[in-house]
Amino acid sequence: MPLDPDSSPAPPHRDWFFPPAPPFLPSSRARTPRAPFPSTSRSSNPYSFPDRRPPPTPRSRSRSPLPPPEQQKQQQPPPTTPPPAPRRRDPRYAGVRRGDVRTLTAEKAAAAAAVPTAAQVHGSKSAASATTLRWSGMVSVAAIVLCFSSLVRSNSSLHDQVHHLKAQLAEATTKLQSCITESSMDMSSILSYQSNNSTSQNRGLKNFSLLLSLSTLYAPLLILKYMDLFLKLRSSQDSEEEVPINKRLAYRVDIFLSLQPYAKPLVLLVATLLLIGLGGLALYGVNDDSLLDCLWLSWTFVADSGNHANAEGFGPKLVSVSISIGGMLVFAMMLGLVTDSISEKFDSLRKGRSEVIEQSHTLVLGWSDKLGSLLNQIAIANESLGGGTIVVMAEKDKEEMEADIAKMEFDLKGTAIICRSGSPLILADLKKVSVSKARAIVVLAEEGNADQSDARALRTVLSLTGVKEGLRGHIVVELSDLDNEVLVKLVGGDLVETVVAHDVIGRLMIQCARQPGLAQIWEDILGFENCEFYIKRWPQLDGMQFEDVLISFPDAIPCGIKVASYGGKIILNPDDFYVLQEGDEVLVIAEDDDTYAPAPLPKVMRGYLPKDFVVPKSPERILFCGWRRDMEDMIMVLDAFLAPGSELWMFNDVPEMDRERKLIDGGLDFSRLENITLVHREGNAVIRRHLESLPLESFDSILILADESVEDSAIQADSRSLATLLLIRDIQAKRLPFREAMVSHVTRGSFCEGSWIGEMQQASDKSVIISEILDPRTKNLLSVSKISDYVLSNELVSMALAMVAEDRQINDVLEELFAEQGNEMQIRPADLYLREDEELNFFEVMLRGRQRKEIVIGYRLVDAERAIINPPDKVSRRRWSAKDVFVVITEKE
């Protein structure tokens, strides 16, 4: 069969994979292969790769490489059958063979293997393309700036030419209309020529000014934008990454604005000057005015954005609008700076950060529940001076302190209270409140743990003594523990006066338990509302005996002498025959320091005592409800005061073994107790059945202590004390004999007959209850209800602090009156000094008291509710009753 490719058509089974040729493709003759395709039998398992032999790769137009001839010979199987006749091939698929599938797969694998190499090439070229783009951007920005500059320059040139033509036209018109001589016309033409020459000379300067302003404006922006690019090009690729110049510049600006106090106003001033200067240069480039006029015009555009409305021409209008926009930004910045400055100033004033410029003021350091009473007492003391200044510094917000003080609602009486926020441990804060110029510094104890509070007070004293300017006034320190007093005085030296609040309340409770009524007397003496202690020198009294000095003051009561020869020591209740020497001062009880003065001796009758006897002491039974930190000190003081055979019952929830251990650790020696016997009872003071186990009706005095071992806050301790008080009074009222008869005799008043409060008031006739109240508000509540005989609170401590702050010498007097040795304040019956219905004036009663080595300072009538200290009219005679009582200062027995 002849192999004619044109005569025989392509067999249909050869085109089973390829689609028919499109009609528009031209037909071409296929190339004749050099060797015919081998005839192979189809395997029964076409997917069995080990038995499958690939056909030899024919020569085609494919780019895949052909194996060498030796390999082709090895791969070609021996012919088993004669080769078939060559068939006509489709010209559309010339060069494509069925055996090329593996070759195509190899080509795809090679192409896939070549892909990572192309990606690497592309990545290596990305940096170069980015650099090219950045340079292209730089060139574009520079071209835009140059185009804009050329447009502005062309516009200004056209504008100048128009003006020049108008000027020439006006000149020509003038020449035609006027009839002037030829010489004058020649002169005007010469002047016009000179002006044209000067205009052409100034035009170059104006163009330079315009370009200078634009370049100055855009050059920093371009430098900042492309500075990092320059640095990256100069640095090597292996070097460490550096911080961009933009970030470094922003950091430097931030540091400058943060550290320099005047940085923001300085930046605003520089920005304003740059805007005026660049705007003036730009206006000079587009206007015919002089440079000074353009600078002034630029300032007017900055100051008032509406001034650019009169500009003519495109160039002047564009520059004017730009300057006005910059001026608005500058004034917005200035407004923001002014607003921030005013806000910071008001915020500083609101938070109490400003300095106090005061002198001879009272400085209070710290914050506690005693602050209200302290401020009230100091304000009353300053009333005679026309008011004063009190500065309070604590670690609280100023507004919060002012709000708390406003809630106290007491009359300041002309005294100004200034609050500042700060720490007394920081010298800068102490200088802020003018600590060196204060006449007195009061350090309040913190609420909470006593040792921590005293430790902080000690650090505060160290800070105060470290002030370089020195202290003009003295330091009054409130301590919580008596054991820490020695350490604080050791650190502070002569500048420090201490008031141990816990010890003061404990000793007052013991005195009031022995002599009911002393609490009210101490409130009158310690407070500035009535009479208090004053020390003053009176030269006219030198050479006079103390017995005569005693009756020399119609409006005061002398109590002691400050002896100059003893180094200023104060002697309470001196001997009658002591003669005042030069430099001695007199201690008196008076209403104020300017309300008393010595007067001539009055005429008095010196009588004799009705009987000379010593008031016998009888054994007493006292109950302590609760536990205090200084219980051992109270026991020792009570043992010194009571008669032999007395009993002290201790009722609290502290186990008995723990009580003995705490008392021994506190320094109590049980073997040294001579007059009292301790009786321990364990129980809860707010549980009724526990209280009913006690013989409450047999106690002479009951002391309800603020149980600090159970409660932490003052309000919780007061609530517990109030509950104990009500339970004890109710149990006593139900145990009294003839309760119904006694209740029926209750005086009609605030409470109706048979009420439980009336029963409690009747029960108070049998025993006295002394309640320790920490919060003054609770004290006022109990005082109004009258269910407790006497209430002692922190208000007494505040009074003592205020008195010592006004005069530090009074602290020695108070310490002696509170101590178990020396002189004390007592209440005596009237029959010790006079007879029934005897008429005497107060001076004569005072002289009767001197026969017992006592100083009578006041009295309380039988039908009166309160005692009168320092009676106003001491020369008026009156009839006394044997049931009246006198308040005296006498030596402890």
Curated annotation (Swiss-Prot):
Does the keyword GTP-binding belong to this entry? Answer: no
Major subcellular site: nucleus
Pfam family membership, one: Slo-like_RCK
- Residues folding into a coiled coil are 156-178, 389-415
Q: Where is this region: Disordered?
A: 1-94
According to its UniProt entry, the protein's GO biological process terms are: monoatomic ion transmembrane transport
Transmembrane annotation, as ranges: 132-152, 210-230, 266-286, 318-338
Provide the protein's localization. Answer: Nucleus membrane
* InterPro entries (alphabetical): CASTOR/POLLUX/SYM8-like, CASTOR/POLLUX/SYM8_dom, RCK_N
Keyword terms of this UniProt record: Coiled coil, Ion channel, Ion transport, Membrane, Nucleus, Transmembrane, Transmembrane helix, Transport
Residue intervals of the RCK N-terminal domain = 359-500, 619-792
For this protein, the record's SUPFAM superfamilies field holds: Voltage-gated potassium channels
- Which stretches does UniProt call biased (Pro residues)? 65-85
Where, by tissue, is this protein expressed?
Expressed in roots, leaves, stems and panicles.
What turns on expression?
Not induced by mycorrhizal colonization.
Q: Which GO terms describe its cellular component?
A: nuclear membrane
Q: What happens when the gene is disrupted?
A: Defective in mycorrhizal symbiosis.
- Which purpose does this protein serve, as stated in its record? Required for mycorrhizal symbiosis.
Anything further noted? Answer: Can restore mycorrhizal and rhizobial symbiosis in a Ljcastor mutant of Lotus japonicus.
Family, according to the entry, reads as follows:
Belongs to the castor/pollux (TC 1.A.1.23) family.
Q: What is this protein called?
A: Probable ion channel CASTOR
The organism of origin for this protein: Oryza sativa subsp. japonica (Rice)
